[in-house]
C-alpha cells in the first residue's frame, strides 16, 4: 500500500528510468510529486475557426486533414511533412519537421484537434509542429494544461503524465490537515479538489479555488510551526537578568531618545528579564537610532553581570560601531574592544584574554568573533547588525559561544510585520517607526542622461561650499562580461578626476580593497581629505559621514528600491540640506515608476512595501532563516491578504490548543513536524 513517503519509482506508470529523471527536480516521494506545482498554465480550451486566426496566437483548431501527409527530404538531411486541414471557415497548412512516421497517426479525411502557434506564410495561415489528437480522444488539447519547471531529461509531457499518475495513486491518502471549522470559515475547498485542480484545472475558476486553498494551507502551517518553535524556545532558560530602572541610563545620554526607541528598549528589556532567551528583531528605517537600542541592551546586560558580543558585516561598520559606542559606554564604565580580521596578533591575544577573564564587557567585531579561540567568561547577549548581510549559520555560531544567550538582531531593511514573521521565523519584532529630531529629509530626483551637465555643476557647487559627495556606480553587463570591479570603479573615478573635476579630490572605494585600505579611504573621506568618493555599493551599509550631503547613483535602474533607500541613507546625517540624485536613461515604464517612488517618499516602510509589490519577495527571502520550510506555492507579492488571514486563523487555533494535542489536530501536528524537519526536535 502506497503512502506519501513512497518512492515514485514504485508508482504505477513511472518506474526506474522516469524516477531517476524526476529526482533531478528534487522529486523522490509521492508527496514530492504532487507538491511539485506548475509554474504556469496554457489555456487550450478555446477552439477557433481557421478564418478568425491571428498570427502569433496559440490556439486550438478542429479540422479535417485534407492532404496526404507525405514526408520529403530537405537540406541538411532533415525530413519535412506538410499537409492541410480544413474546417467550415477555411484552410490552414501544417508543417512538421523530422516526423517521417507521421502518416501512421495523422490520416487524410479524419478530424483532429490541433494546438499550436499560428504563423502567416503570406499565402495562408500555418502551424509548425502543432500538438494534435483525434477528436473525442483528447488529453492535451481542449483543456488547461500545466507548465512545470523542468530540467534536462524531463519534458512537460513526462511531468504531466507523472503528476497524473501521482494524483491517481494518492487519491485516498491525502489527509485534510485544516480543521473543518477553519476550512469552512474561510470558504476553502477540500484537499483532493485542490490538488487535482492545481495540476489539471477543469476551469480558470477551479484553478483559482484550488490555489487559494493551497496557499492558505501553506501559510497556515508555517505560522503554526513558528508558533510551536516560539513556545519551545520559551521553555529554555535564558541568562538571568533582574528588572532595573532605565532612567539612570537615559539621563546620562547626550541626547533624548524617541518614543519608538524607548518602546523597542522596553520590549528587549522585557524579554531579558523574562527568564527566557530574548530572540528579537529590531527593525527601523535608516537613521532611526537602532544602535541606541543596542547600547541600552548592552548597558542592561553588563549591569546584570553579562558580557556582550556585537557582530557587524564589514570591518568598516564594525569600526564605526566601536568609534560610536566605546566613548558613549565609557560614561558607564563599560570596557569595549574591537576584534576584526586585521587586528594585530599582540592586540588580539590581549582581547582574547580580556574576554576569557571577564575584564572586557563588550567585544565588537566581524566574522573574526566566530573563530574557535574566541571564548567568553560570561556571554549573555549577542547583537548582530544588518541581518541581511549575515548567513544565519554565522549568527548561530556566535550564539553557541554561550548557552542560549539573549539575541538582538538589528535590521535597516524595513519590511511589513506580517512578512517579517515569515522571513525571520521565531524572532519577535520591534519596529522603530520615527526618526530622531534633526534628522534631515533628503530631497530625491530621478533624472535622465540629459541632466548630467547640470548634475556635475551641482556637485561642483556643493564641493565649493565644503560639502562632500558619494557617487555610486554599479557593475553593468552580463556576469561573464562585467569588468573587474577594481578596474571599473577606478576607471570611472579617473575619468571624473581627469575630465570632469580636475580641481576636486576624487577617491575610490570598492569591495576588492584590503580592509586596511578601505579603512584608510573611508577615514580620509570622513576627515574631509577628499571631495568625491566613487564607490560600488560597499557604502550601502552603515557608513556615517555627516559632511556628505549628496548621493549620486549611476544607472539607478539596476537597483531595487530598498537598496536605493539604503544608499540614500548615507547622506542627510549632518546639519546641511542633503540630496539624492538617481541617474537613469531607461525608457521602461515600470522602471520609471519605481524610481518615481523614491522621489515621493523617504519612508523606508512605504518603499519596502512598494519594492515587494513591484519585484516580489525574492530579495527579502534571501534573508530567510535556515530550517524554515520552503514556500512552494505562496507568492507574497500578491498573497499578503491570504497571509494575514492564515496568520489570524493560526493564532486563534493555537490560543485554544497551544500544543496541538487534541486528537482532531493530530494530522495537522504531524504535517508541521514533517515540514519543519530540521527543527523537528524542537516540536516534540
Predicted regions and their residues:
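C-terminal accessory region of SF2 helicases/translocases
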Residues: 587-684
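N-terminal pre-P-loop "Q-motif" helix
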Residues: 255-278, 292
